[in-house]
Structures are given as C-alpha cells and as structure tokens.
C-alpha cells in the first residue's frame, strides 16, 4: 500500500483538517464512529482507501492523521465534535499555552517542548504503514503555531524521513484581510524553511476563497466553515487517485516530478471547478470544456494573484467523475490555442492529467452542488511571485523600524534570522523572475542550470 500521513498544525491546519476528514468519511461511507458498513473484510485489506485510513481488528477505520496545537481550545472542539470517536485520543496533541502569533514561540520556546511527542506519534503511524508514500502537512503561516511549530516539524521530518515527499497545504496571509499584525514576519520566517523542507506547497489564501464563495456560491458572509469545505474539495480531488481506482491515477511523487522544474520553485496555485450553488447547477451543463476553462479563470484561483501576469511552467489537471480522455484532450488543446494562457517557452507540453471515475461528494447541507464531473487544477505559475512580493513589501515596512522584533528576540531568536529569511525570499523572487524570461535562441543550452 502507498499510505499517506496527514499532519494538521495550528488552528488553521486543524480546521481545514476537520473539513477534509468530514469529506473523506462521506466519500468512503465511513460513519463518524469509524465503522464502514460497506466494507465487509475485517482487518487490513488492500482497498484503496487504506492509504488514508488504517483498520483495526474491530473493523474500525482510523484516519492516518495527527492534529497538533500549542493550546487546547481548537483540539478540544475535535475531542467533543461529531467525529470525536473517529480519532485515537493519542492523535490529538495539544499543549497548555499558545504561540501567541509569535513564530519564535512556536519554533523555539514552546514548540520544541512538544515536537518530540509529535514525532513519536508520527513514528507510530509510520510504523503502521507498509509503504509510506509521504506526508501532507496542513498549516497557516500567519499565526505562531502553524508557522513556527509547522516549520520546526517539517525540519525534523526531513531528518527522520529524508526521502519521503512532503506536500504542504499552506494558508498564506491575504492582501487586504489580516488576522494578525505580525503576519508578514511569521510568514516570511516560515517560508524560509518551507523552501527547503517541502517538496510541493499549495498556496491558499482566505481572501481569494472568500471572493469565490461570494461570487460563485452567493454566500453573503462566508464563514471559515464555507472556506474550509471548499479547500477540502481541492484536497479531496488531489488525493482522489490515491483513495479510489481510476483511469489515470496519480501518485504523490508524480506531482513533484511533473510540477517542480527546479527545487525552489515549488509553490503552486490551485483552482477548482465547478464551484456552483445547487440552484444554478440545475440549469447548467458543465461540460468538460466548460469546467476546464473555468479552472483557468483568474477569478477562480485560490490565492490572490493574476496568472495572466505570469507564465505557466507546468499544470496538473485532476478530473473526477464522468470524464473520458478524449474530452480532456480536446479541451486542453483549446486551452493551448488561447493567447491569454501562456506557457514558458522551455516547457512545451506542460500538462499532467489525472482522471478518476469517482464523482465528487458534497457535504449534506453544504454550499456546493452535487455535480457529475469536476476538475481540480494545480499549476506552477510565475505569477505566484506576486504573493511573495506583497508579503516582502509588508515585511520591509515593519522591519525598517524594527517594529515588534523584540517579541521574537525575547523568545530566543536572533535578529540575523530575520534578514537571512528576507534575503532568501528576495532570492526566490529573483528565481521566479529568471524562470519566466524568454530563453534566447542558442544560448539556453550552454548556460547549464
């Protein structure tokens, strides 16, 4: 089996995690107590869903997941929520005092007390796997726990499981909406380690997803639950081929191979289509061509940046439901003829396609319509550099005055780490710029890169 372990760090990661496991359980027909009426074989079994769930002798299905937070309130909601019986109590790890939006507390002072316990629990899950494929790490980098403890954990995972892939689903601060004053500091310090210790990072941004909820689902005031359910659909589509059987299945490592041209350039943009409310879906056809086009709409991107300002390096389309390769090829051919969607000249093919026959499931009482076919696109575009340059600019404004820096230094960080992380991001922006430059005829070969 090719198992995957999910790690949810901090409030953002845990709440996205709740939405994901709720959806996975619905997709596989697993009840909130872990029983699965449709699964007749007790014990192991070679079913595809065993990549995400392990099965006990009593026939109970337990998610291969760990939830970590430095303070108890959010995890207590999981402990008392609908799915409290789904998780093993040891999978829910919470500390006593939180990171207070401070990267240094999450990474140095408070995080380091809890990180060994986390790694122990992860080791137990890993020992329970026959062929561990990699980790999915969910966190947000605006706060203290997600950024600090999240990056500490990734660093330690690199040491313990060097060869395993790590995919990050990371919530980045939004351009307009802010939840903490020190977001730019936390996210830049955290990205500094994401650069080195994740293989693929999918960037999500609340503001972009708010706008999608308002525009496509007509929700006037979207809540985090609305956002998280949308993110869960994306993650479900990405992992569908690990959990169900399909025509063109995609492994975690395949993402990496197809999406990452250079190790540092691994920050992905995602979109999902059709995001449509039940009232509208009734009147629309939503052919493969239509959903493919809307996946490329700048307005449907889950991070605030405009792909028209950049070039695509690679792009992975995960279709699910009633989709045949012929339609996919036709609609991708149409996309390639469009002038608005530009690929870099050194990557002529650029498309990776996965097809899974299991249609997407929706949460009962949720906002999304049940549709016959859906697509999730993960693309590597130079436009994502906009997200970094925005953050860098905010970081510079604060750091020029050394505002709030004493909180970090007081927790044992050195000021040099700020400038080191900032320089690393400046280099990253430069990398993105260089990747998008046209290669002149004949000189591209000699330059060796």
UniProtKB/Swiss-Prot annotation:
Site feature location: Involved in polymerization: 449
Keyword Nucleotide-binding: yes
PTM entry text: Undergoes a tyrosination/detyrosination cycle, the cyclic removal and re-addition of a C-terminal tyrosine residue by the enzymes tubulin tyrosine carboxypeptidase (TTCP) and tubulin tyrosine ligase (TTL), respectively.
Reaction equations catalysed: GTP + H2O = GDP + phosphate + H(+)
Subunit organization: Dimer of alpha and beta chains. A typical microtubule is a hollow water-filled tube with an outer diameter of 25 nm and an inner diameter of 15 nM. Alpha-beta heterodimers associate head-to-tail to form protofilaments running lengthwise along the microtubule wall with the beta-tubulin subunit facing the microtubule plus end conferring a structural polarity. Microtubules usually have 13 protofilaments but different protofilament numbers can be found in some organisms and specialized cells.
Family of this protein: Belongs to the tubulin family.
Role according to the record: Tubulin is the major constituent of microtubules, a cylinder consisting of laterally associated linear protofilaments composed of alpha- and beta-tubulin heterodimers. Microtubules grow by the addition of GTP-tubulin dimers to the microtubule end, where a stabilizing cap forms. Below the cap, tubulin dimers are in GDP-bound state, owing to GTPase activity of alpha-tubulin.
Name of the protein in question: Tubulin alpha chain
Organism: Tetrahymena pyriformis
């Amino acid at each position: 089996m090719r198992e995957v372990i999910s790690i949810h760090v901090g409030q953002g990661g845990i709440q996205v995690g709740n939405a994901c496991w709720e959806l996975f359980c619905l997709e596989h027909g697993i009840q909130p107590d872990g029983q699965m009426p449709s699964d007749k074989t007790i014990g192991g079994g070679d079913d595809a869903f065993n990549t995400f769930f392990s099965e006990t002798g009593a026939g109970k299905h337990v998610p291969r997941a760990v939830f970590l937070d430095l303070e108890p309130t959010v995890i207590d909601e999981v402990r008392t929520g609908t799915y409290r019986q789904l998780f093993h109590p040891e999978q829910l790890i919470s500390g006593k005092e939180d990171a207070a939006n401070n990267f240094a507390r999450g990474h140095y002072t408070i995080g380091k007390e809890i990180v060994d316990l986390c790694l122990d629990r992860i080791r137990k899950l890993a020992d329970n796997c026959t062929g561990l494929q990699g980790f999915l790490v969910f966190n947000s980098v605006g706060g203290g726990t997600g950024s600090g403890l999240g990056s500490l954990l990734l660093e330690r995972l690199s040491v313990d499981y060097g060869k395993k892939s790590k995919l990050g689903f990371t919530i980045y601060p939004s351009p307009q909406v802010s939840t903490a004053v020190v977001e730019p500091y936390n996210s830049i310090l955290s990205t500094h380690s994401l650069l080195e210790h994740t293989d693929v990072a999918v960037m999500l941004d609340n503001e972009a997803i708010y706008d999608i909820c308002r525009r496509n689902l007509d929700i006037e005031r979207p809540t985090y639950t609305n956002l998280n359910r949308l993110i869960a659909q994306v993650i479900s589509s990405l992992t569908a081929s690990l959990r169900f059987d399909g025509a063109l299945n995609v492994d975690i490592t395949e993402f990496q191979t197809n999406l990452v041209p250079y190790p540092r350039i691994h920050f992905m943009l995602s979109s999902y289509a059709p995001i449509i409310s039940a009232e509208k879906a009734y009147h629309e056809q939503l052919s493969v061509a239509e959903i493919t086009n809307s996946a490329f709409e700048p307005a449907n991107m889950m991070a605030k940046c405009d792909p028209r300002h950049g070039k695509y390096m690679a792009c992975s389309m995960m279709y699910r439901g009633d989709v045949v390769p012929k339609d996919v090829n036709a609609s991708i051919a149409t996309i390639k003829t469009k002038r608005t969607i530009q690929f870099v000249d050194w990557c002529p093919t650029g498309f990776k396609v996965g097809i899974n026959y299991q249609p997407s499931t929706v949460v009962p009482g949720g906002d999304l319509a049940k549709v016959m076919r859906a697509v999730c696109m993960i693309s590597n575009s130079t436009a994502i550099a906009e997200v970094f340059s925005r953050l860098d600019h905010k970081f510079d404004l604060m750091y020029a005055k050394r505002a709030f820096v004493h909180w970090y230094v007081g927790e044992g960080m050195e000021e040099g780490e700020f400038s080191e992380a900032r320089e690393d991001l400046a280099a990253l922006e430069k990398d993105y710029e260089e990747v998008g430059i046209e290669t002149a005829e004949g000189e591209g070969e000699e330059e060796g890169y």
